[in-house]
From Swiss-Prot:
GO MF entries: arginine deiminase activity
Keywords: Arginine metabolism, Cytoplasm, Hydrolase
Coiled coil: none
Major enzyme class: hydrolase
Location within or outside the cell: Cytoplasm
NCBIfam families the UniProt entry points to: arcA, PRK01388.1
Main location: cytoplasm
Catalytic activity: L-arginine + H2O = L-citrulline + NH4(+)
Pathway: Amino-acid degradation; L-arginine degradation via ADI pathway; carbamoyl phosphate from L-arginine: step 1/2
Protein name: Arginine deiminase
Length: 406
């Protein structure tokens, strides 16, 4: 088996990509945070301490943690990768011909470590040491960004997701996140950990306009036994799911994709904010969104080129059939109606399973964590008072690249 393989949501987690977004978070302000898809400004120092605790918790469980900025820095050691990234981020059409050339020359003066930090964390006009014959530069406020920060890279789950023996480099729904995909394309194409490995790649063409076919990894659950569960959400479209399904079937990486319809609401922007897999038959669920009667479709291959798409009447039955189970143990968000809504908002259902029955979760969600404990789920608590304000929990902040099947 290729070691770059994610066979389930609950098998032993062996290797994962995280991101510690120091520079990007320091560029968040009350003025720009909403454009950058954050609801609020985080305390950088506290958020980084919480992220360090998350890393340590995983490492204490034997998980190999790779940091995105380190991977990008190492990728930039390859001249072809550096040229490719700068070409796609600093174009004449974005900045004008003279200004683009001068920005590119300025960036090339930096070390790979500094360049990786800038690409991920942003660059303001005031940081440029030159004045170009550029109307764009002359018209811009000094504190506007030449290169926008990417604080959402914190949520490494979304930009790329490994599905059995392949990786989907996702066409993101929001403009503020589209640049993230090219960082992962470069890493998977040129970083030594990946460049000599044989694995399927989906949505890899950086020159293709994917139009309405968007998909984000928070909506993708690799539930095992050749099945993939995907949420139709505000970020993931039916077109994106069908295109992903076709590529998975073409490369023989899945036998069925199950799609379920979510409300288009920020509180449940991805499937994993309302449902995660914790043990063989155990799921964490926010019951106001996930129920057996929700819209559900089974997608299977139909010959070499087509899909068979069937609407299914009972989501829970579809899930049990896919996983070859006789029953499901559904743990709903804890507390009364008010407490459950508050805890779902703070990612009580967004847990990262380390191995069957062992999960990482925010400690603040006491009512839900108590229900997990009573159901026999061992919770490894982490602080998320700041990180959680970005609207993502432990699963959102992790991209497994090596995990056992079931």
């Amino acid at each position: 088996m290729n070691k770059l393989f994610v066979g389930s949501e609950i098998g032993q987690l062996r290797r994962v990509i995280l991101h510690r977004p120091e520079r990007a978070l320091s560029h968040l302000t009350p003025t720009n945070c909403h454009n950058l898809l954050f609801d609020d400004v985080l305390s950088v120092e506290k958020a980084l301490l919480e992220h360090d605790q998350f890393v340590k918790t995983l490492e204490n469980q034997g998980v190999d943690v790779l940091l995105l900025q380190d991977l990008l820095e190492q990728t930039l050691e390859n001249p072809e990768a550096k040229e490719w990234l700068l070409k796609h981020q600093i174009s004449h059409y974005r900045f004008g011909p003279t200004f683009a050339n001068q920005i590119r020359s300025f960036l090339l003066e930096h070390s790979n470590k500094e360049l990786a930090s800038i690409l991920l964390g942003g660059l303001a006009f005031i940081e440029l040491p030159f004045k170009a014959p550029s109307m764009l530069q002359q018209l811009s406020d000094p504190f506007d960004f030449v290169i926008d920060p990417l604080p959402n890279h914190l949520f490494t789950r979304d930009t790329s997701c490994w599905i059995y023996g392949g990786v989907s480099i996702n066409p993101m729904a929001k403009a503020a996140r589209k640049r993230e995909s090219n960082h992962l394309r470069a890493i998977y194409r040129w970083h030594p950990l990946f460049s000599n490995q044989d694995f399927a790649r989906y949505f890899e063409d950086e020159n293709r306009y994917y139009d309405n076919a968007t998909i984000e990894g928070g909506d993708v659950l690799v539930i095992g036994k050749g099945n993939v569960l995907v949420g139709i959400s505000e970020r993931t479209t039916p077109q994106g799911i069908e295109n992903l399904a076709k590529q998975l079937f073409r490369t023989h990486q899945a036998k069925q994709v199950i799609a379920i319809k979510l409300p288009e609401d920020r509180s449940c922007m991805h499937l994993d904010t309302v449902m995660t897999h914790m043990d063989h038959n155990v799921f964490s669920v926010y019951p106001r969104v996930i129920d057996k009667n929700m819209g559900c479709w089974s997608i299977t291959p139909c010959g070499e080129q087509h899909l068979d798409i069937k609407e299914m009447p009972n989501f829970q039955n579809v899930l049990m059939s896919a996983l070859e189970l006789d029953n499901l143990n559904i743990i709903t968000t804890g507390g009364d109606s008010y407490e459950a809504e508050r805890e779902q908002w703070h990612d009580a259902n967004n847990v990262l399973t380390i191995k069957p029955g062992v999960v990482v979760a925010y400690e603040r969600n006491t009512y839900t964590n108590e229900k997990y404990d009573k159901a026999g789920i061992h919770v490894l608590p982490i602080t998320g008072d700041e990180l959680g304000r970005g609207r993502g929990g432990a699963r959102c902040m992790s991209c497994p690249i090596e995990r056992d099947g079931i």
